[in-house]
Amino acid sequence: MQQDISETDDLNLPSKLILNNKEFQSGTKIVRKHGCGSIVGTLSGPHRKVLFYLYQNKGQVVSKQILKRVGWAGKAVTCASVLVAIYEIRRVLDCRCIQTISNEGYVMAD
């Protein structure tokens, strides 16, 4: 079940995530290859929050509105910001694990 998100929530997101042999850490935008540590790309803070939230809610459709509040809490952003975040996450992950559900949102495959 998805967490309720408000403008002031401090999300309980993991500090580290390994997906598709890539290592993401909440405290740095650098993405490393798992095991050898070589840098494979970067992911901004809001984009990492979106990724970690989708991971925590694997198998569930998460709306763009929720992802806006997760990544950019308290800031006025459009759905285009979410679209860019999903694009960048997919590019860095180099996999098809995040699917678009038309008129609903996004889901990370189990």
Q: Which residue ranges define each predicted feature?
A:
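DNA-binding patch around the recognition helix
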Residues: 5-26, 31-35, 39-43, 82-110
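Short amphipathic alpha-helical recognition elements used for nucleic-acid or partner binding
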Residues: 38-71
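Glycine-centered flexibility sites
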Residues: 59, 74, 103-105
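Secondary-structure boundary/capping signal
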Residues: 62, 75-76, 97-98
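A broad structural signal for alpha-helix termini and local helix breaks/kinks
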Residues: 71-72, 93
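Short, positively charged loop/turn segments that connect secondary-structure elements
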Residues: 72-82
